[in-house]
Design a protein with these regions (language model features):
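Histidine-/acidic-rich catalytic cores in large beta-rich domains
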Residues: 1-177
Length: 177
């Protein structure tokens, strides 16, 4: 049986013990933890089932495992304006900004270290997803599990036709130029 422990940890595999633990109590139902070049851990804290009075909101946290301090965080203003009860992720970009996928609502944003939103995109594609999926009472959702930004010179793009004219009909349907 798998359980969500609302805990982050670093495990030393050979000796089979934790070298670092953070939680429970600090985050709830988090996703997408990743190590940053500075040794810190970045993750999406979904915030589901957070205890009152600090109820439903999500945030991105950058934790310093050396002292368990939150070195940086991002949350909505007001807090409930940024909430994804499931899925989602965050990825630090080479320029220091953070790419965020607010998964349940299909929203992508890039924010600066100073919390300024540089750009925003909302997935325009909705599909049948079952009752209450993505926070929708209609059963239609535009949820997205995660986002990743590829650099123009990324080897994964080598030899691929990325000419937007090739996808003209799709771009017109979705309202892109």
């Amino acid at each position: 049986k798998k359980t969500q422990t609302s805990k982050e940890a670093i495990v030393e595999r050979v000796e089979r013990h934790f070298t670092w633990k953070w939680g429970p109590g600090e985050v709830t139902l988090q996703h997408n933890p990743s190590f940053l070049d500075n040794g810190r851990v970045l993750l999406f804290d979904n915030g589901s089932h957070r205890r009152a009075p600090n109820t439903n909101y999500s945030r991105i946290v950058e934790i310093d495992p050396a002292n368990n301090d939150i070195a940086w965080d991002y949350r909505g203003e007001p807090a409930i304006s940024f909430y994804s009860y499931q899925i989602s992720g965050a990825e630090r970009q080479p320029n220091g900004n953070t790419l965020i996928c607010e998964g349940a609502t299909g929203r992508f944003i890039e924010v600066t270290a100073g919390h300024q939103i540089v750009w925003e995109y909302i997935n325009p594609l909705f599909a049948d997803s079952g009752r209450l999926a993505g926070g929708s009472s209609s059963g239609q959702a535009n949820s997205v599990f995660r986002a990743h930004r590829f650099a123009p010179d990324d080897p994964a793009l080598e030899g691929r036709d990325l000419d937007p004219a090739r996808y003209g009909n799709l771009n017109r349907i979705l309202g892109a130029n």
